[in-house]
Amino acid sequence: MTDSQMADFGAAAEYLRKSEKERLEAQTRPFDIRTECFVPDDKEEFVKAKIVSREGGKVTAETENGKTVTVKEDQVMQQNPPKFDKIEDMAMLTFLHEPAVLYNLKERYAAWMIYTYSGLFCVTVNPYKWLPVYNAEVVAAYRGKKRSEAPAHIFSISDNAYQYMLTDRENQSILITGESGAGKTVNTKRVIQYFASIAAIGDRSKKDNPNANKGTLEDQIIQANPALEAFGNAKTVRNDNSSRFGKFIRIHFGATGKLASADIETYLLEKSRVIFQLKAERNYHIFYQILSNKKPELLDMLLVTNNPYDYAFVSQGEVSVASIDDSEELLATDSAFDVLGFTAEEKAGVYKLTGAIMHYGNMKFKQKQREEQAEPDGTEDADKSAYLMGLNSADLLKGLCHPRVKVGNEYVTKGQSVQQVYYSIGALGKSVYEKMFNWMVTRINATLETKQPRQYFIGVLDIAGFEIFDFNSFEQLCINFTNEKLQQFFNHHMFVLEQEEYKKEGIEWEFIDFGMDLQACIDLIEKPMGIMSILEEECMFPKATDMTFKAKLYDNHLGKSNNFQKPRNVKGKQEAHFSLVHYAGTVDYNILGWLEKNKDPLNETVVGLYQKSSLKLMATLFSTYASADAGDSGKGKGGKKKGSSFQTVSALHRENLNKLMTNLRTTHPHFVRCIIPNERKAPGVMDNPLVMHQLRCNGVLEGIRICRKGFPNRILYGDFRQRYRILNPAAIPEGQFIDSRKGAEKLLSSLDIDHNQYKFGHTKVFFKAGLLGLLEEMRDERLSRIITRIQAQARGQLMRIEFKKMVERRDALLVIQWNIRAFMGVKNWPWMKLYFKIKPLLKSAETEKEMANMKEEFGRVKESLEKSEARRKELEEKMVSLLQEKNDLQFQVQAEQDNLNDAEERCDQLIKNKIQLEAKVKEMTERLEDEEEMNAELTSKKRKLEDECSELKKDIDDLELTLAKVEKEKHATENKVKNLTEEMAGLDEIIAKLTKEKKALQEAHQQALDDLQAEEDKVNTLTKSKVKLEQQVDDLEGSLEQEKKVRMDLERAKRKLEGDLNVTQESIMDLENDKLQLEEKLKKKEFDISQQNSKIEDEQALALQLQKKLKENQARIEELEEELEAERTARAKVEKLRSDLTRELEEISERLEEAGGATSVQIEMNKKREAEFQKMRRDLEEATLQHEATAAALRKKHADSVAELGEQIDNLQRVKQKLEKEKSEFKLELDDVTSNMEQIIKAKANLEKVSRTLEDQANEYRVKLEESQRSLNDFTTQRAKLQTENGELARQLEEKEALISQLTRGKLSYTQQMEDLKRQLEEEGKAKNALAHALQSARHDCDLLREQYEEEMEAKAELQRVLSKANSEVAQWRTKYETDAIQRTEELEEAKKKLAQRLQDAEEAVEAVNAKCSSLEKTKHRLQNEIEDLMVDVERSNAAAAALDKKQRNFDKILAEWKQKYEESQSELESSQKEARSLSTELFKLKNAYEESLEHLETFKRENKNLQEEISDLTEQLGEGGKNVHELEKVRKQLEVEKMELQSALEEAEASLEHEEGKILRAQLEFNQIKAEIERKLAEKDEEMEQAKRNHLRVVDSLQTSLDAETRSRNEALRVKKKMEGDLNEMEIQLSQANRIASEAQKHLKNAQAHLKDTQLQLDDALHANDDLKENIAIVERRNTLLQAELEELRAVVEQTERSRKLAEQELIETSERVQLLHSQNTSLINQKKKMEADLTQLQTEVEEAVQECRNAEEKAKKAITDAAMMAEELKKEQDTSAHLERMKKNMEQTIKDLQHRLDEAEQIALKGGKKQLQKLEARVRELENELEAEQKRNAESVKGMRKSERRIKELTYQTEEDKKNLVRLQDLVDKLQLKVKAYKRQAEEAEEQANTNLSKFRKVQHELDEAEERADIAESQVNKLRAKSRDIGAKQKMHDEE
């Protein structure tokens, strides 16, 4: 809104919105979005700062105060651009977070703008001073404005609610919440003031309001506030006028929006304030108003003084308030009573009860001498209070001091102590005040209840907000529970609106119901077995205390609900007993006094006096209270309530809250959140921490959180294109037309931003949070670049202009200089001098001629001037006239514009009316269809009823007999019900016993698990338990010494007591008793010590067993170490031999190169080499023999792997024999064919290929052998597993059979009970069938009536057809008229366009446009008048609605066309005005054309008149048609009245019949439900038993599988070890490679151990889940002996797994460090066992930690074993590759031998063959060298194979990650099982509740059966009446048809 529009708000404008100047200044303020930020602050929550630097996740910033702070990067929050300063709707902030919201509120509050929107919220801050924003001028300015059209205000919220109610036909509500002192009451008053002012402008008379003795309804609604505030408001620390109750005010409106009535509901009145106030607070205002002495007659009537300090109940705090004038407030309260219609008697009663409460507080009592009973200490105040209450003073005192109490069936008088009497007085005073306040509310509602018709309402909820105090009690729980429900309601509503916005805009969005976020907390409070339920249950038990209530809360919710927590008590604060996690924060609650507060007990003797009071008001207040004797019968029969007195406070609050939520769910809500800025009541000061606390509590930040989930920023396409086109102008070209949406899409797609951060709707573009700020930053950067460029170009242009001027000056100076120099050169010439003299003479003659010419010219100019002056005057006159005409035309255009605006508004209203009518038409059609269906049903039922009418008369006698039988059966069923209740009570007791047994079994099971874990801990807790046990032993020794000292002290005390025996006998007795007790304690201690000693001896024996096992393991380890040493030495030897061989090969190659020299030397060297080679071969054979010896020794130890290795050796030998045969063949070929050496080489190459293939085949055979061996091992393990499983399952089968026998016995008893109940239900069903038969006969009569009604409806349809024909004729006339008018107006438009082209002048165009607009306006007015008439017809006639709807759409199109044409004419007007300015000089020439145009205009006016005459004729014809319509309408109205009467009568009869039928059906359904529920409950019990059995079996199976896994892993480890020992021979040759593999394996082992640490947490969670599953075993396990047996088995399993774990770790790590560590751990365990004389309680606490560590170690061992198996497989693969390489090496060695042999032969041949042969040998040597290189390449390939194995290890790590995922899946499965367990528990609870409800329903049904007969008689009489009435109506209808 502009400043001119804001002027409508008057003086309030500056307090509502920033001016345009301020907005411009804010937008031009320098701002850097990258550095401006908020940082957290200890005092101020957040402060503004500028970022100085960033490094390492830390940000250094400088605050506004100059302070430098360093914070984490995620704690820094960006500031919003200046565009968003003091923004009205905080949801539009681009950076929407806590500091942005806080500072926006703070800056607006500093400018006194106290109202701010936050999405759906309106946040208001208390200004603590008067602001001119509520006067009548502001009310008028806000009326009818949309929320976006006006500044934020409570009036805007109110008006929107009012407008929504009128347009949407939906009830509205305004929810105002906040802390005390935040301004809730003031805003509530303003809302009511607004509604009273805008909705009551019409009729202010009192004729429709008979209850209004004084004042109108509006006055009464406004005056209800002062009356309620006097009795419900009080001064508190924060607020002088704090409402101490919540209220929901419903203001009802009629169909037109006028006030109709109002009513008020109140919640949670603070009763305790009546008798107690804090120092800085005071009681309710009414007490001090009475004592203000403004009305002395009141003081005399109430027998009080004017000094508040005379009365204890009202003087505990302050007695006066500076801001409140109690005397004036008394007059306002009294006048409010008068306006609200209170009688004098009612006013006096209210005042008397208020005075009596003050006297109550002054009553004194004292204790009787030598008794604890109380007696009155003076009766003056008691007499006064009794007089004012209309009681007898003596009876009152007697009732207080000696109330009557019922004991059994008799009443006894009970004596009260002084404290009990004072408590009783306080409770009575509070109860009287509360009931009086509730009566006032009821009385005010009766006054505000008028007889005016009401259709909709607007509810205003004023209730306390969320409360988190240091001390939170029952009241805070109720308030916070209420706010939790309201916040859930808001969350759900808010996101529903967001979703509707997204759906309307066509944005894809997945629905999220944020309303469910708070469901867990709400369920915790209100659901069965919730906090409220447990509180009410405890109130039922006489011996219940606050601590038992706390224990039940802990048992049911601690650890089971995340919202229920154990509080952390802080020193200096009051104790808290439990904590609840609400949406606004965690609240600690103190439960002291909750049971008394909830029960709110009263002295029933005094209440009985109240009921008999002579004061009418007092007797009325307590008339509904049921005392003990009145409620006795209800108790005995188990009724629902013990009257109203037994209804607890929590139950009443829940009931009221459910009603409120039901009301709110039927309304469209609006939310107002009030904020208190500071606690000092200082205006303009805002305390940041206080405000942040409230924003969290009242849901503003919660609302922002929800808003941020979607797209909080949204801009219209046009606005976005206009503002951000500058970012990329090329995306939207200037010259061509592009739709705004397409332009926005192109623009955003061209920018470098995340496309998921925005969405395109139908009319708007939606942005995620923060993106708009990024766009603003990009726009600012773009603008700065553009402005910089413009500035540069402008400066350049200016400088170029200046430079051009300088150049021109220089050129001019040069010309002047040249001319002066030329003149100076010729001025002394004689001819020049002569020229100077003659020149003036020549000029004088010329001047004379010029003067004559000038005189002539002057005369001519003078004449022309005179003519021009005359012409100018004429033109001026014409200009004045034209200007006048122009102004007139402008005024006319403005008037036409206003008229057009009015027409548009009326058109909008018509469109709205059309929509409403369409809705009504739909409703009427639906109603018509329903009525037709009902009519059909009624006619059919009518026929049936006529047929059955005769049968009914016969059945009446039968019914009387059946009724007598039913009465007998009723008595029988009552007896059965009693028996059933007794049986149910017995069942409840059985269930309670079962639950106790269940708990006992759970505890026993838990104890057994603890024992099991303790036993496991004794093995696995190493260093930690050692230290702790040593400390415990020291503590025990210290405690033993202390016990000895205590014993010595006691003996000394005993001797001293014996010496003092003569002093006093009483002290001796006491001391002897003490001595006896101490001796008993000592005996107990000694007994405990002996027990612990026996336990220690057992533990020592166990430790000895463990020590033996450790020694065996150590011996085994030593053997393995010796074997390892032997392997290492063998490997060292082989490595040495290999190095020697390689060295020798190198020497051979060198010698072969030198073979070209002397052959004799070479022969000698060859011989030496051969000798050395022989020696090396012998050494190698010896080494192989040694290795074979060691391998044989190992094979003897491990017989399983001998066969496998033997087969492998056989295969290798076969391959070797083949190779040797081939070698011999090669030798023969070499001897035979020495000349063909090349062919031999080729043959050799081929044979080598063959050998390689054979070797591959051999490898394949070996792999197959390994697989078969592996499968054989698997079969053996499976066999062992199946044997163990069979044994275990046999044992479990025996246990389960015993268990099943127990369950079957229980099931038989339950089935017997169920059969009894079934028999009872069948008897009841027979009675029901008899009644159902009677009901069917009544239905037959009803069907006959419905047939009659159908005939009436057919007649009605006939009339409607006649009416529709008339309406169709009207529609034809209207369409004819509209088409003619459209054609004529189009002709006018064409003619005026031709006129405009001919005139080409602005004034003519203006006149043409004006004429056009006037004609359009006239025709439009006529059409609108006709439309209004037709709309009235439409409202009267439902049948013609469809036709009128089509015509209305046509009219809308025509109106849109005219509107478009008018806009075109406006554009033509603007263009013509521009032309008028440029062509004003040509007006004179165009005068003739103007006159011709006037003639044309007159012709068009004549045509217009003809058209108007035709229109008038048509309107007359329409008027005649309308008369006919009116006559038909009258007939239709009469018929409708008769139809409505008949329909209402039929509906009443049908309703009564349906009601009776429903009652009987409900009774039958309830009986069936009871039967089904009992059967379902029994089935569920059976299912629970079966489920528990299955769970137990599942747990046993899981234990068995874990045991099998352990055995498999152990066998696998042993098998791997055997294979490793068997493969040692092959690994000896490749020792270096094996060492490298071993080092890599160690690295992978370390990685696996690190991975084990990572997965340890997940395994812990899985173990916890397993523990939860194990608890289910306790449901079916009845004996502790079974658990002990399982304990023994599990111990054995643990010992086995422990041994396997140690073996696996020892085999994997392969170092002696682990052995030494285990040795030290075992020795420490031996020491620990000796010192296990610890206290049992301390030992149990430490056992839990140790058990956890044991589980971790066990899981770690399992993981390590599996990793070891995987690593062993990998190692086996590497060993296979190394074996392959070894075989290749052997082959190479064999080829070397062959080559050596050939070399020897070659040398011999060389001796014979000479140099040629030597050259051949050299060539052969070169080929061998090439082969050697090839072998080296193969070696490199083997290295590559090793790298592949490394990649395989990486794949194994990936498999471990998959194992992690499997663990996660297991965890999910465990969670699901836990949820199922909880669901089963919940079902059991619901079954118990259902049983209780079924019993109550059973009792209800009996009562309803008694009422069924009476209702059947009533229905029959109504049917007879309806028959007579329908006959009369049929006769009337026939008469009407004949007329």
Swiss-Prot record:
Residue(s) carrying Phosphotyrosine: 1261, 1310
Segments of this protein annotated with the region Disordered: 1908-1939
Domain Myosin N-terminal SH3-like: 32-81
PTM sites of type Phosphothreonine: 379, 1277, 1284, 1311, 1515, 1681
Chain positions recorded as ATP binding sites: 178-185
Record-annotated IQ domain positions: 783-812
Coiled coil: 842-1939
Start-end of Basic and acidic residues biased regions: 1925-1939
Entry GO CC: myofibril; myosin filament; myosin II complex
Locations listed in the record: Cytoplasm, Myofibril
Gene3D superfamilies in alphabetical order: 1.10.10.820, 1.20.5.340, 1.20.5.370, 1.20.5.4820, 1.20.58.530, 6.10.250.2420, Kinesin motor domain, Myosin S1 fragment, N-terminal
Pfam families listed in its UniProt record: Myosin_head (PF00063), Myosin_N (PF02736), Myosin_tail_1 (PF01576)
CDD domains xref list: MYSc_class_II
GO terms of molecular function: actin filament binding; ATP binding; calmodulin binding; microfilament motor activity
Domain Myosin motor: 85-780
The keyword Coiled coil appears for this protein: yes
Residues that bear Phosphoserine: 417, 1090, 1139, 1271, 1309, 1512
Residue ranges of the region described as Actin-binding: 657-679, 759-773
Statement: the UniProt record of this protein carries the keyword Cell wall biogenesis/degradation: no
Family: Belongs to the TRAFAC class myosin-kinesin ATPase superfamily. Myosin family.
Note: The cardiac alpha isoform is a 'fast' ATPase myosin, while the beta isoform is a 'slow' ATPase.
Subunit structure: Muscle myosin is a hexameric protein that consists of 2 heavy chain subunits (MHC), 2 alkali light chain subunits (MLC) and 2 regulatory light chain subunits (MLC-2).
UniProt name for this protein: Myosin-6
Gene: MYH6
